[in-house]
Amino acid sequence: MEDAKRRPLIGISACRSEEGIHPFNRVSEKYILAILDPTCGIPIIIPAIQDMGSEIDHSDYIDGLLLTGSPSNVRPVEYSGTPSVEGTKHDVARDKTMIPLIRRCLQKKIPILGLCLGIQELNVACGGSLHQRIFDLEDKFDHRMRRDEDDHAKRYRPAHNIRITEGGLLNKITGEEEVNVNSLHAQGIDQLGDDLTIEAVAPDGIIEAVSFKNADQFALGVQWHAEWPRPIRSFNEKIFRHFGKECRSYAENKKI
């Protein structure tokens, strides 16, 4: 493994939740492990505290940003959507922390990799909108995991194919044109954000991957959980390794 002094600092988005009367900021261990290997970066947890008046700008020190999945959904107010159905889980603190941070990272050309909720945050940060409940749309299938599955291997098993855009970034990184991916999301991209391009779609037309059009900026979002299962599949490993390479390049250029 590379010397720690040469490894990039990669911010990982945390979620705020409560346990009893105590608020917590949490990150699933699988995201931390994915940054340690195969990305070979140093994971830095970014707490969801911007709603409490924090003035810390994490883009000042990170060399990359990993947007994690979450049980929560982006609030419709962030993209001028209709109010959520009662009972929909939201994380106000994460929305107020991560969406502005994504925009600052794009301005500074800091590499970004978004997973599941992360691709949705990237799309909203770029001015796009979301389908709040894909499973309610007549021409779409249910992209959620089975509610009765509590076994990780079954929950994260491949659920459907995606068709990868020929000649696109994801195609160039992985060399693949069609693969099976897991599927654990209720929301999905509706209107594509500014300066984003489609990298992959599901059989029902739901956007499964996007990238930033600017060749000088690495920003890739995927709708599946590329970090799981472990060991990471070869297809997903290529994504993380490329992300790590982009983060190292950013860190080196920052020193110049």
Question: Which residues are covered by each model-predicted region?
Answer:
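N-terminal beta1-alpha1 cap of cysteine-dependent amidohydrolase-like domains
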Residues: M1-L113, V124, H131, F135-T174, ...
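A short, structured beta-strand/loop element
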Residues: D216-F218
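Hydrophobic, aromatic-enriched interface-forming segments
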Residues: I119-A125
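Active-site-proximal beta-strand elements of phosphoester/diester hydrolases
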Residues: L220-Q223
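Conserved G/P- and acidic residue-centered "switch" motifs that form tight phosphate/ATP-binding loops
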Residues: C116
